[in-house]
């Protein structure tokens, strides 16, 4: 847990005095990552200048840079890393020109962020929480035993300060990395939907479900251990209350409680925000499908015409006269000549009659589900109704049935953020995606 003893003006003056600065273009950052990777493979953690030049040569080749000035550019990059306190250089008078280099804590921190901290692991989080639980229990036992000031510093304050607090910071960092990954997933989904949403639906579903599962896994692990951690912190807090000279322990316990509450609270809030985004994506896809139902045939027809010579096809039609009247202008002209302008009441009479009949039937039949508190599978109900009507009316009938059914209640599975399975509702490929309504 980070604590700053200096004030803001003091820190600013200190940074200005020491001329701190970091500048890492993509090629220099790649060089630093290469050094960290090669350094991790060595037992002594040391690298010679020749090994650094070899690493720089790999990076230079990857960026397709010239190899004629590789030595000069590598030397400049190494000196720049040393100046920015990313590498430490150790020289010896006995072996002049043969320096040894080690990564600084700053260099390790940057490379850890890009390499080791990018992968979420439930096992790693569980091990961290297990270690924290053990440290807190021992600290709580020591606090209840009591003792002199040395006892409190060694057995209570030190484990909380240098073990528990650092692991809490690591968990907090994991959550912040998950925030970045969520934003990256959102950008990937946006790019997929902008290119071809129909082909991207399966990829979007995979990205949404994977992120939801990871967030839920992280939160479940935290909540499972959160109560025990808070209980041990309260034990320590209760033990310090009779002692006025243990304010430093009490302050640290309060900071740890706030950190733990913030971690668990943000985990749940992150899940809620992701559920909202998941619904937004599905709403967009459903809207696009509704708007695109008439475009599907046109797109398939256009593709078939373009590939006719590679894949010939034959058109079978039942009404030759109808085939000649495909232009909108001609159809409108013919309708006006034969029937004139159709009255509004007559135009919607048949549809309104169907809607009234269906509403009465649905209200009567679906009332049984609400009365008996029986789950309502919307896919089965819609399929049953569509089987009673011709294919031409399936779209309107399905819309009416769904509109009436959702007024009865909601599906508790909607709040999990997991998408429902697609269910066929007729024999012509139409499907519906809806959870079972089980709360009226």
Curated annotation (Swiss-Prot):
Keywords: Calcium, Cell cycle, Cell division, Chromosome partition, Cytoplasm, DNA condensation. SUPFAM superfamilies: MukF C-terminal domain-like, Winged helix' DNA-binding domain. GO terms for biological process: cell division; chromosome condensation; chromosome segregation; DNA replication. It is found in: Cytoplasm, Nucleoid. One of its GO terms (molecular function) is calcium ion binding. Residues 208-236 are annotated as: Leucine-zipper. GO terms for cellular component: cytoplasm; nucleoid. The keyword Cell cycle applies. Belongs to the MukF family. Involved in chromosome condensation, segregation and cell cycle progression. May participate in facilitating chromosome segregation by condensation DNA from both sides of a centrally located replisome during cell division. Not required for mini-F plasmid partitioning. Probably acts via its interaction with MukB and MukE. Overexpression results in anucleate cells. It has a calcium binding activity. Interacts, and probably forms a ternary complex, with MukE and MukB via its C-terminal region. The complex formation is stimulated by calcium or magnesium. It is required for an interaction between MukE and MukB. This is Chromosome partition protein MukF.
